[in-house]
From Swiss-Prot:
HAMAP family listed in its UniProt record: Salvage_MtnA (MF_01678)
Name of the molecule in the record: Methylthioribose-1-phosphate isomerase
Top class in the EC scheme: isomerase
Active site: 236 (proton donor)
Record gene name: mtnA
Pfam families cross-referenced by the UniProt entry: IF-2B
Keyword check for Amino-acid biosynthesis: yes
Swiss-Prot/TrEMBL site (Transition state stabilizer) positions: 156
Any one of the GO BP annotations: L-methionine salvage from methylthioadenosine
UniProt pathway annotation: Amino-acid biosynthesis; L-methionine biosynthesis via salvage pathway; L-methionine from S-methyl-5-thio-alpha-D-ribose 1-phosphate: step 1/6
Length: 346
């Protein structure tokens, strides 16, 4: 499918496919400043933890270009980097990308702003390419866990649109297809932003992979009827004990999968694993604007004055997870030991 994250040398800008309007139209959003990057992250022009990380990496470069000519460019740049890092609280990839650029700056020593920006742009492009490669490796390992004829349920969108390309959870689906297996997908619609109905269905349909959209509240019936053989989801953060923080509703899907004896897998690159955070309950959960729940498009669907919950994520406890599929292989319980060894070996 179309590359949805593109760096344009001609514009000196990051050009993003605006996911708010998919699948009905394909608009593009140009990011030239720190505020552009922050807006793209906050309003979800771009979303999905790996894609957020790639966007943030390019954003650091743009933040540097923005302060050119400032007498105190170092202080201004620090402020811009902090703005980007704090744009969204849950996805660890955002923090990782900004801290990676801060590390490079610290190690570069007394370089000029132009030199720093050149180093950052090179690193952002590397992160971009590396993310696609990691997703392809996740697909290879995860595809081996899928059986010919499986119907795979997924929640939210952890596909090419949520990464630099190929996808994590949908990378597993693509990996299975590449291995010659016939698989199909049930995409939970994923209220309130409808990432499953709008985005997962969009990219799988374009790729010719069979997909059906299900209402979120149909999961139990579909599993009871034997229509689901595996569940594969992505993650915005995996904590040190193997808890997986993903789109709101994932926890409920995992509970149902256990009830019906269906393997529940999490697909995520290693840099989505946060060994500094002990458990999923320690992760800050983003509470988004009420209008995402009270409105569908421009149409209000709840009475004026009624309050709503709009938590964007929930933590799925590690005991519900059959395996965490990474580009380094599949982690199995006990996850605390597996994750510790992963970071010791890498």
């Amino acid at each position: 499918m179309t590359e949805h994250i593109q760096f344009s040398p001609e514009k000196d800008a990051l050009v993003l496919l605006d996911q708010r309007y998919l699948p009905t139209r394909e608009d593009w959003f140009d990011c030239k400043t720190t505020d552009d990057i922050v807006e793209a992250l906050v309003v979800m022009v771009v979303r999905g933890a790996p894609a957020i990380g790639v966007t943030a990496a390019y954003g650091c470069y743009l933040a540097g270009r923005e302060v050119a000519g400032s007498a105190d460019w170092k202080a201004e740049l620090e402020k811009n980097l902090d703005k980007i890092e704090n744009a969204r609280p849950t996805a660890v990839n955002l923090r990782w990308a900004v801290r990676e650029m801060k590390r490079i700056w610290a190690e570069a020593g007394d370089v000029s702003l132009d030199e720093l920006c050149a180093i950052w742009l090179k690193r952002a492009k590397e992160i971009h390419v590396d993310d696609i490669r990691m997703c392809e490796d996740i697909g290879k390992f995860g595809g081996e866990l899928m059986d010919d004829g499986d119907t795979i349920m997924t929640h939210c969108n952890a596909g090419a649109l949520a990464t630099a390309g190929y996808g994590t959870a949908l990378g597993v689906v693509r990996g299975a297809v590449d291995q010659g297996k016939k698989v199909s997908v049930i995409a939970n619609e994923t209220r309130p932003f409808l990432q499953g109905a709008r985005l997962t269905a969009y990219e799988l349909h374009r790729d010719g992979i069979p997909v059906k959209v299900a209402c979120d509240n149909a999961c139990a019936l579909l599993m009871k009827k034997g229509l689901v053989q595996k569940v594969v989801v992505g993650a915005d953060r995996v904590t040190a004990n193997g808890d997986a923080v993903n789109k709101i509703g994932t926890y409920g899907v995992a509970l149902l999968a256990r009830e019906f004896g269906i393997p529940f897998y999490v697909a995520a690159p290693v840099y989505t694993i946060d060994p500094e955070t002990p458990t999923g309950d320690d992760v800050p959960i983003e509470d988004r604007t009420p209008t995402e729940v009270t409105h569908v498009g421009d149409h209000r669907i709840t009475p004026e004055g009624v309050e709503v919950f709009n938590f964007a994520f929930d933590p799925t406890p590690n005991e519900l997870i059959a395996g965490i599929i990474t580009e380094k292989g599949v982690l199995r319980p006990p996850y605390t030991e597996a994750i510790k060894k992963l970071f010791e070996d890498n």
